[in-house]
Amino acid sequence: EMCIRDRGYTYEVDEDGDYRMVFDVEGDRTQMVYVRSSVEDFGTHNIREIWSPAYIAKTKQFPVAVANRLLEDSQDAKMGGWVKQDTTAMFVVKIDADASADQLSDAIDAAIRTADAMELELTKKDEF
């Protein structure tokens, strides 16, 4: 939270305690991003996740073409990858829980740019 406040970001805290923000992106579009408040542990690593949604499937399963496109994009992404969260395609960047404000800002930027580009490609809309 300190890094988020230090940057002067406008945010809401959702029911899970996560930080929800909306940023302006190119082409008069906006993109939603969540900085998870919970920290995941793996061995000596403490990991914070940044999530940004791009697509909602009409059924529980993603269409094959969409799933394959998300996998291809995950390979190209410098930071993060696509995950399926229920019916939502979510771009997730994982960073050190003690990342600096600059590192957090870069991770947020990677998430919103990647998710917004995919949302535009798959849906031609700006719902997130």
Language-model segments: what does each one mean?
Residues M2-C3:
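Short, small-residue-biased leader/transition segments that mark boundaries at the very start
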Residues R7-A57:
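Ser/Thr-rich, low-complexity intrinsically disordered terminal regions
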Residues T30-M32, F62, D96, S100:
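Poly-acidic low-complexity segments
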Residues N46-T87:
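Short, internal acidic amphipathic alpha-helical interface segments
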Residues A65-A67, I108-A110, K124:
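Short, charged/polar low-complexity linear motifs in solvent-exposed/disordered segments
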Residues S74-T114, E119:
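A short, solvent-exposed beta-edge/loop patch
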Residues L122-F128:
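Short, highly charged C-terminal tails/helix-capping segments
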